[in-house]
Amino acid sequence: MPMIDVPDNNAFDVAMRRFKRACEKAGILSKLRQIEYYEKPTSKRKRKRAAAVKRYAKKLQKEQEALERERTRY
């Protein structure tokens, strides 16, 4: 569980925002959503593979854009 230090002069909304950010970084909500329902192992593999393909496509697109920028620069 993420913990934050709240000085006396800080407002509640600032502390809440910092706590939410800490929870997001720790991955608590995503983990909760994953274990909320049982997911079959085949579905889990399929989801992870789709995420990997998406990451790879995004990486390729960034590389292509960088190449295009290099070509147009000269």
Curated annotation (Swiss-Prot):
GO process terms (BP): translation
MF-aspect GO terms: structural constituent of ribosome
Keywords on record: Ribonucleoprotein, Ribosomal protein
Alphabetical list of Gene3D superfamilies matching this protein: Ribosomal protein S8
GO cellular component, one term: ribonucleoprotein complex
PANTHER family registered for this protein in UniProt: MITOCHONDRIAL 28S RIBOSOMAL PROTEIN S21 (PTHR21109), SMALL RIBOSOMAL SUBUNIT PROTEIN BS21 (PTHR21109:SF22)
Family (UniProt): Belongs to the bacterial ribosomal protein bS21 family.
Name of the protein this chain belongs to: Small ribosomal subunit protein bS21
Upper lineage: Bacteria, Pseudomonadati, Pseudomonadota, Gammaproteobacteria, Legionellales
